[in-house]
Each structure stands twice: as structure tokens, then as C-alpha cells.
Amino acid sequence: MSLLWVFYQNNVQKLNLSNLPSSHPVTIGPDVKDSVTISTIPFNSGVISLKRKESGGQYEVFLGNDCLGTIETDISFTLQTDQQDIRLILTGSEPEKSVYFTGNRDEIVCSSEKTNADIYLNPQDFAFAEQSTFSLLRAGGSWSVRPESGTIFLNGEKINANTPLKPGDEIFWNFTQMRVTEQDLLEIVHYAQFETALTETVKPSTEMQKKYPQYRRTPRMVYDLPDDRVSFSFPSQESDQTNRGLWLVILPPLVMLIVMGVVAIIQPRGIFILVSLAMFMMTLITSTVQYFRDKNQRKKREEKRERVYKLYLDNKRKELQALAEKQKQVLEFHFPSFEQMKYLTSEISDRIWEKSLESKDYLQLRLGTGTVPSSYEINMSGGDLANRDIDDLMEKSQHMQRVYKDIRNAPVTVDLAEGPMGLVGKSQIVKNEIHQLIGQLSFFNSYHDLRFVFIFHEEEYKDWEWMKWLPQFQMPHIYAKGFIYNEQTRDQLLSSLYELIRERDLEDDKEKLQFKPHFVFVITNQQLISEHVILEYLEGQHEHLGISTIVAAETKESLSENITTLVRYINEHEGDILIQKKKAVRIPFRLDHHQREDNERFSRTLRTLNHQVGITNSIPETVSFLELFHAKEVKEIGIQQRWLTSESSKSLSVPIGYKGKDDIVYLNLHEKAHGPHGLLAGTTGSGKSEFLQTYILSLAVHFHPHEAAFLLIDYKGGGMAQPFRNIPHLLGTITNIEGSKNFSMRALASIKSELKKRQRLFDQYQVNHINDYTKLYKQGKAEVAMPHLFLISDEFAELKSEEPDFIRELVSAARIGRSLGVHLILATQKPGGIIDDQIWSNSRFKVALKVQDATDSKEILKNSDAANITVTGRGYLQVGNNEVYELFQSAWSGAPYLEEVYGTEDEIAIVTDTGLIPLSEVDTEDNAKKDVQTEIEAVVDEIERIQDEMGIEKLPSPWLPPLAERIPRTLFPSNEKDHFHFAYVDEPDLQRQAPIAYKMMEDGNIGIFGSSGYGKSIAAATFLMSFADVYTPEELHVYIFDFGNGTLLPLAKLPHTADYFLMDQSRKIEKFMIRIKEEIDRRKRLFREKEISHIKMYNALSEEELPFIFITIDNFDIVKDEMHELESEFVQLSRDGQSLGIYFMLTATRVNAVRQSLLNNLKTKIVHYLMDQSEGYSIYGRPKFNLEPIPGRVIIQKEELYFAQMFLPVDADDDIGMFNELKSDVQKLQGRFASMEQPAPIPMLPESLSTRELSIRFKLERKPLSVPIGLHEETVSPVYFDLGKHKHCLILGQTQRGKTNVLKVMLEHLIDDETEMIGLFDSIDRGLSHYAKESDVSYLETKEDIEQWIETAEDIFKTREAMYVEAVRQGDAQNLRFSQVVLMIDGITRFQQTIDTRIQDRLANFMKSYAHLGFSFIPGGNHSEFSKGYDSLTTEMKQIRHAILLMKKSEQNVIPLPYQRQEPEIQPGFGYVVENGKEQKVQIPLCSAERESAR
């Protein structure tokens, strides 16, 4: 063992280097994180560090970054820093440990000199030993150490005077460590051999150590503080002292004597003078003598007074000293330092956890040592100080009172039970003291009574990590440590703690109750919980709820006003109490010395202790299931043999536990024994669920599956049935883990159906009891097995409170079913107020495990015995009126099976402060057994094996599980046409669950109703996807009106979907109605021709089958509220379309959103959950099951009512996954039907249209003189203006309405159509100027340009006229074709202003005379520009009846058109093409400005 000894400033510390990794640096500095902490030296030059050399046991010594040298084993190394010497010694030898018996010795002398030494250590035997001597003294049962010479250390500090020893104190002398234990044993750890007169012995083991790790409290030694009353008497009054001096006594007679002498000289009188002189002389002498005599007597009296009172004070001093020492000893005993507690813990002292919640001091803490008030009383008896002087004796008396009024160097304590406590000071000091405070509470208070919750900064985790081993940090209600250091741990722990405390707060008479465990919250990070609701309890006075709070901060301003006790830490050695009981005080104290190194060992030791509570007796505390059968392996039970030999008709007795060491307790539910029905009660942690599992397993082991079976009622899905899920005896688990409103109805329907089934079998075989039927079955006369059915309900109290009718009917059914072999066991945590007369009268046996209080015990047993049970699994069995009343220990089926197992780990997990985090699973070899297998698992495996071996078939279960919430339609595919599974029906009264199909031609239109979010749209998608899987796009056309939230959007790309409509596509919907009406008329005509009335017959007879048309409207509420006209059309559509193969499916959030006339046309109605349930009654009346707020849960009304769960269109875990899967399935269908013709969509104009897009997308026909103007608004087909037929065209429109764009569109085509000549007159903004560069275009700017163009055109026309006349003469005029000569004008007014009358006349003549020769006149302008004027050109233009209108028809009078009411505005890009008084609304393409880019 390698130890480093550090000597400095009359102190010594040691560090075990063997426990440190070789690469770990050893540091000596002022910080607590250093390996050795020396807080009294600032280390301004840097900390001292030791680095191990690669070879040997040498260390290099550094001061800061400077290497000072090398330290070797058994060689001293001294260095200096901050003018302080520090001596380092490295020892490498292994120390020896010896124990010696001190006997009756009151003094043990330890010395390096052999004379009179009880322990002699020769300094020459150890290199670092020196001449020194000290004595161990025993007085009054306590030891002390008295140094006499040399250096002696106590707990690492040098001592110079006699010092009392406390438990765990360690004496260091010449590298020998000594410790007094057990009052008469001396432990010595030494490196050098020594001689001693003491007897060596072996340290005996205490009872606590022998029973370790089991720990049980012993009677606590409680010492009272001395409360004597010490009265001080006044000293006798000091005698009055005259102030007259000697001169004042002799002066009067002396003066008289002198006067008489003078008189005698002046006037002699003879004898008179002599007499007077004698008298005055005598007076003088006697006065002097009397003065000295009185003075001597006063001195003697005063000496006596002082001697007597000093003796009195000395006695009082002894009395007070004894009281003071006693008080200090009591305080030291009850409030030892944390270091002493660590020592006591290492010795497994019986003082561990000696306090309980009933102790008055259970939350008192030691802060350190200081001056405390005496517990005894000191006063002065009688007398009035006002009437006497304070003399020296009085002052001594008062001084003694002042000295003993306070006890110095005594433990200073605070009581956390008084209210929240605040700690302020430097963070490092406060944290260091928190270690001690938590350690004290952990030592004295058991984890049964006290739990910690520590809220700190995450970066400080390493500082507090040792505390996680303290059992008090394990939360009682969850598997987590009481460490809160980030948002995750805060959210995981504080919410549940808040609920727990709130439950306490809501308890009646909470002020009188004592809650367990008591929670101590230690908070160093207030910010983390600053907004949490638990602060309402932590910041207030709530100790009666079992919570206390310690808050640490750097200043008191950071604390709340609710602090009851405030402790300030001034520095590393001093502190004071500023507030106590909410009153300002100032109580200084010195901090206890504390070493953190042993903290983790302390906490781990406490963690290993198993604190036992209660009294043991002969009943075993634990019994495994296999022990009931005296078996070590499951094969030894003989299950198969028991099945073959057991007879349930005679007895149902099975073992459930032990009532003595070898006395087994049996429970027999035969009606002639303990049965048929009973009750079980046990609070949380009592072993109630384990008892039920043991009883179920015991029945399964004893009886054949055809003789005993179970139906478990696990209302909240607690997992009681989980271990038995595969055994043949379990017929089902009735659970309501989903919170179904139909739980009671479904469960009762299942149970009643089972009773009816049994009654039918009894009638069939003419028996009236289960025992008779069992005999017939065993004889082979009855074919159907009928086992005893055990109905076992766990947590029936909660079930009764939420489903009272169900429990009442269940008990009634069990009463009726007793002869049918039905047994009922009701289990609850809290029987108080739950067991009514009906339950009690039908329960013959009762099992009471540990219950919460006497009231619960009396409720089930009629006595309070069960309230006193403390052992898990312990309980009372009571049958009838105490016919049987036994205390027993139930067997534990969850015990590990075969403790001597082998194999590998099957699970690896990280143990965190908040629980277990699984990392991986490792498969074990086939021949290796799982070391985590329990007895119940082993027995269940054996039962399954025997079942397979015997070929036993599991009986059908009367209980069908609740419908799943997500069922994909792919589980029940629809392979037939006109037969589509769309939902899964639940019929518990028939014990049947099966898919239900929709037959299109029989079930007709579909109405789907339900509130938002419950699956209407998804149901519609299910239908459509089912249709698409079976029908081809040629057989089925789908129209989707998606007025909802877009759920059906992925189906818009189905190959079967003709079109997809949104709410704002009114024009598209209008076109659809036109199309569908035309289709209805067409189909009616075809049916009349075939003389048939239904599509089924038509498709059977006709060679060309008609496709089914399925119209789907999602969110019909919109139609009802905003599309009134469309609603009437849909009503007609639903009425007329069904027989024609046109079907209708709608969804709505309210039934009232659908008109009754339409509702009557919906043969199939599907109702999801409705917020107003009464709406559904108009469709299906009063159902036997209530609709639950579960998406997809529906009531289907066809020829009957069905309760069902709708299928999902795809298999997905959530809505996002479903959306993606739906798109994927649609893509697959697109690929599948890619080669087939898909239904034509409703033609709609594009949002924007260019001339390029018009020519490419719509495949324009190339016809001579036919100019494509745009797309027809209705048919979305190209509309042409035939210049060969109509010759001239007006372009009418207001400013900025697109006239120039129309001219561009016409120019583009005319230029490409090889027009012979185009005259182009532009508007003022020159919008057509870029056409001037075209070879066929003459850009006309001036009057002269126009005249020249007219001259050229006239020459052409004269030539053509001659040709035309010649062709007429020859009869070939119809075959004569001329290329077009076009005059286009953008802005007719500006054109009229440019030309004169002569040009007007010539152009008017062109229009009249040359139109047949290829002249076309295309002017553009405002309609008013064409209607004004009477010149020849204007007159001729007024005759034109062909135009392109870019305005409302009613706003112009140039071309007469029919009047249209409420004519809509013409939007930009739209216009009318008018030919001979008939208009077509068209979308006009936008022509690009640069023609070159388009070429």
C-alpha cells in the first residue's frame, strides 16, 4: 500500500495512492477538488502536483509548472510555498492492524521511552519516529488524550493539552494510528513493531454486524439535558466601615489638651488644670486603643466572610461544571459530527436510523460547535440588589453565573421541523456543509421515514454523485433517484411529487395525520424550479404534510420571506445563525471538520442495509410457489398426473401459502367448503396481485383446463393476466384499458351469453348442477367441456365507482351461476365504503392482506387485525362467521426459478437517476437458461408443454377483446366485385367479431356522419381505395368533392378519378352538373331502348358495359350552408342515379346538415362519434352500445344496426404515415392501369394562357384564313375567327382591356399564314411597333403612308378584280382563292384624325367592293368610337356584325346582342367572339412582346 503523508501548520493528512489510477495526477491545493485540500495556505505560486514516473514508485514534485525534485519511498521531501513549510513523506510498506483489551486501566502511557510505558515504540525501528510521550486517560466512562512531549495529532490536528476523545477519533503518533472502540478496546494500525503490556484480542462482532445486511432498530438511548435549578445566595453584607481616620479620633482631645495647657500657662488654676490634663490624656489614649482594636475585628470578620463564600462558590462551580459537562456530553451524544457518524456507520452501529418520525429531534441538525445556552437554570435567591452594594464576592458570584450560563464548544443545532431553512454564504462553503447536513439526516433517519429531493445545477453533478447511493434518495413511488438537475429530471420527478403532496393536502384531518415518508427538499438551483407549481408547498409552512425545505444561496436577498431559520457561513471555519423561529438572533459557531473522501463509502454502507420493521414469528416471511409443493423444479410438481386424477366435482382445494413453518393453507372454492365466491383486500404493496397470480397458478397446476378456467376482469389493464396469456385455462381478460364507455355492456353481454350457453347444455343433458355435468363429460356422454369458471376482478373498487351497474349485475349473475360452476373473486385496495350488502352476502370467504387502516380492516374482517400487518404477502383467511380464521404467508410465484443458473445476460441497460435505459438485447444460446426466469414463467411453460403433449384444445372464450383502434383494410381484402369489406363488426352477445361488406348495387348511396377528427374522410378514402383495387378505370369513374381538410387529396391522382373539386371551383362544379345530367339523360335513354330499369341488368345484357360513377362529397355541411342550389341538385342526383349506376357518398359533421329528402336516399348510413349524441338517434334510435370518441368507431345502419371499427385505407401507424402510404398505393394503381383509358376530367380553362401554350397544348388546326382567338370557356376548345367567311372584325373594349393583345394574336397568325400584305396603324403608345420589321407588314404612321398603302392595295385589288371577272365568265369563280390583304388599326379615333375624307371614302369603298377579293378591315377601339360619326368609313364599320368584345355585352351598342340578367364582369384575358349576333365566351392568350423569341 502506497500512502502519501502531508505535514503542514501543525496538521497532517494522508492519501492512499494505491486507489488512484497511475495516470491520475495528485494535487495539493486550496480547492476541495484537489487530492489533498489545504485551505489555510493560498498557494499563490500554484498548487503542488505529483506525477508518477513510468518506472518504480517515484513521483516528480511540481510547484505550479516548476519541478522541485523527486520523492521516493520512505524519504522525506520538504518544500516551501507562501512562507509555509510543507513536508511530504511517501510510505510503501503494508501496515499491520492489532486490537488490544484495555481492561480496568484508567491510564495507558504511550512513549518512545521504555520506562513506565504501556506501549513502547523504539524510534530507531522507524525512520520517521521521534521522541514523544502521551497518555490515554479514562474518567467517568470517557477517554481523553494528554500529550506530554513530542508531537501528537488528533484527527489530523496537533494537540497540546488534554483533549476528550469522541467515537471515531483517531490519534496519530509516530506514524502509528490509534482508535478507542467499544470503550475498552484499542485499535492500533502500525508500520513498526512495538512492545505493549496490553492483552491482544479480537474485535468482537456486534449483533448488528452478525445480522448484516439485515438491520433492525434497537431501543434508543435518549439522555435528557440537565434541567436542575441552581440557586446562588447572596454573600453576607459587608460590615459598615467608618470613614473616620485615626486623626479624627485623637484630634478633639488633643486640641482640648493643648488649649488647657495654654490656659494653665496664662492663668494657672492648680488642681483643676491637672485633673483636666489627666482626663484629656486618658481620652486620647483610650480612643487610639479602641480604634486599632475595632479595625482588627473588622478585618477578621471580612476574612471569614470571604473564606466561607469562596468555599460556597467553589461547591457551586463544581455543581455547575458537572451540569455543563453533562449537557455537553448529552449534546455530543445526540448530535455527533458527520465524521463520527461515518465511523459509526462503518462499525454498523446500533445508532444508525435510531430516530423515527415520532422523535422530537428527528429533523434537528448539527451546524458545528459554539456557545449554547445552558439547559439548567441559575438564579439568585432572595434579596434586593438595589439596596446593597456590589462587592468583590458578589462580582465573583455573578461572573460564575455568566460563565456557566452558556456552554462553550458544544454542538449548535437547528430544527428543520420548524420550517424552511436557508443557507447563505460562498457557494463552495455552503455546498461543503450541505454534504454534512444530508449525511446527518441520512444517518439518523431510516429510508422508511425520510426521503431526499435534491435540486442542483447539472455541472455540479460530480460533487453530489456520492449521495445517489443513499437509500433516502430512492423515490418511494417511482424507480428514480431524488436528483433534479435539468429540465428532463425536473419534469419526470416534480410533477409526480406535486401530485403526491397534493393528495396529502386534500386528506381530511391532515393536521392530525403523520405522513410517511417525510420529504426533505434541498435546493441549490432555485431557477430550475422557479415556475413550477410545487413552489406553493416548498415556500410555505407545510411541515404537517411531511415536507421540509433547505434552500442555499449566496445572499439572503435570494431567499423568500418564508424562511424560518437562516444560517450564514462567514468563511471556511465560522458561521452564525441569523434567524431562528422567524426571529432575529445571532448565534456564532465553528464549522466541523469534514473529509469528503469517505462519503461514498458511508452512503454505500447505508445502501446495503435492509431495514426491517415489525416483529417476526414462525410464519415464514417469504414462500416461493415451488416450496408449496416441496419441489425444486417444475417437473417435480407432477402437473399432468394432477390433471388426470383431480376431481373438481369433489373439491377445488389448492394451496396458497403457509400459516406456520410446515403448515400449508388451502383455499377451496367448492360451494360446500370456502366458496363459491369471495373477497380479497390489500393496499398497494401488500402483495394482492401476487396472491391472485399464485391462486390462479395453483388452480392451473391442480386442475385440467376442462375442469377449471379463468375469466379475468382487469378494468384498468394492470397486467395481472399477462403471465397466463398462453395457458389453456385462461379464457380471456375483460379489460377497459382504452376507457371504453361500452365496457360494462360488452362484459355483461359476454358473461350472460356464457351463462345462457351453460343453461342450454344443462337442459340438453337434463342436469341442474355443474358437478353432474362434469361427470357426464368424463364418462363421454357430454361432448362439450364445461369447466368451473372463475371470474376474478382486480381493483373492483374503481370498477364499482365507475361502473356500479356492472358490478351489481356481475354479482347477480354470479349468484345465479353458482350451480352453473361460476365463481366470483373480487379484489380491491381499499374496501372501505365499497362492499355493500349484496357483495357481502354473496362472499363466503375473505382474504385480507395489509390494508391502509383499521377502518378498511373492519370493513372486510369485522376487526382491525389486517391494519397491523407489515409484511408483504401476509394476510388473514376468514371463512363464513370465523369458521376459519388463519394468519398466513401467501406464496410468491414471481420468485427466481433455479438460482444456480448459467447463461449470458439477455438484457443490458444503463441505470440512470430516472430509471433504466435498455441498451441492447443479447440472444442466449439455446441450451442456456435465462437467469431472469421466474417460477411463474417456468410453471406456465410446463403447462404449455403438457398441453401440447396431451393435445388439449383451448376452449372458446366468452369474452372478445375490444375492437382495435387501427385496422387496415388489407387484413380483409375484397377480392370480389361488388363486395367490399369496410369495417370490423363487434357482436359480443353472439360472441362474434367479423368484417362487414358493402355491396354497391344493393347498399346504394352512403352517408357518413361524425364530428371533426373522428374519421369521416378516412372512411370515404377506405371505400374509394377498395373500389379502385377491384374495378378498372374503365369500370369505375370517381368524382371527388373535397370540401373538407384535404384528406382525399391523394385520391385526386387515382386513375379512376375523373376530377377533383374544391369549394371555390364553382364554375367547375357547374360544368360537372351539366355533364352528369347529360349522362343521366343518356343512361335513361339507353335503358329505355333496352327496356330495363337497373344497371345490373343493362351490363348483363349489353355488349358495352356502362361504368359505375361514384360521386363523393367530403364535408357536406358546406353544401348545406353555402351552396343551396347545389344541394337540391345533389338530392335529385341521389334519387335518380342509383338504378343508373351513379352512386353517391357524402360525409357530414352533423346529421342535421343533410336534408331529410337526401337522408332517405342514403341506404347505408355510417355514424362516427358525434358531439351531440342525440343527432344520431334520428338514424339508429337508441343503440345498445354507446359510440366512443375513438376515430373510426362507428354504428352502421343497413338492414340492421352494427357496432364496428372502420378499416383504414392503408396500413400505417399515424396520419402522416397514412398520407404517405396512400400516395404510394395511388402510384401503384397508376402503374397498374397505365395502359387503360382513364375517365375524362371536367374541362377547365388554364389559369394563364400564352399563344405558345395555345398552339402546343391544344393542337391548333391549320385552316386558311382561320385565326385562333382563344379557348371556349365551356368546352375549353380552340375558337377561330374565319376571315375568309366574315372578312371584317371589330375589336371592342375599354382602355387597358387587351385590344392591342388581340391584335397581336391575330397578327401572329396572319403573318405565319402567308398573308400578302398587312397595313398596320399603331396606337399612340406604339404597342405594335416591333412588327414594323416584318416583311409583310407596312407600319403606317402618317397620312402619306396610309395613302401610299391604299394605292398599293388598290393596284392589287384591280388586278384581282380582273381575274375574278374572268373566272366568273369561265364559271370557275368558286375555286378562285386570294391571299388576304389586311388593314389593322389599333386606336380608330387616332386613325380618323390622321386621314381625310377622301381616304375615308376610299377605305369604305374597299370594304364594300374588295371584301370578296381578300380585303379585311380589323379596327380596334372603344365602343363609343364606333358609334359616333356619320362619315362613310364609320357608317360602313357600323354595318360589321362580327367582333371581339373585351367588355360586358350590355355596356356596348355597336353590335346588338341578347340581354343577360346579372351579367358577370369580363376579367382580363377573357372576351366574347361575336359572329352574326351569336357570342362565345373565350379565354384569349397573352401574346409575347418579342416575336423573334417565339420563332
UniProtKB/Swiss-Prot annotation:
Q: Keywords, A to Z?
A: ATP-binding, Cell membrane, Membrane, Nucleotide-binding, Repeat, Transmembrane, Transmembrane helix
Please give the Gene3D superfamilies that the UniProt record associates with this protein: P-loop containing nucleotide triphosphate hydrolases (3.40.50.300)
Q: InterPro entries attached here?
A: Firmicutes_EssC_C (IPR023839), Firmicutes_EssC_N (IPR022206), FtsK/SpoIIIE/SftA (IPR050206), FtsK_dom (IPR002543), P-loop_NTPase (IPR027417)
Origin, by domain of life?
Answer: Bacteria
Q: Name one GO cellular component term.
A: plasma membrane
Q: Does the keyword Membrane apply?
A: yes
Gene Ontology molecular function: any one: ATP binding
What role does it play? Required for YukE secretion. Probable component or regulator of the ESX/ESAT-6-like secretion system (BsEss).
The family line of this record is: Belongs to the EssC family.
The protein depicted here goes by the name: ESX secretion system protein YukB
Specify the species.
Bacillus subtilis (strain 168)
Please state the gene responsible for encoding this protein: yukB
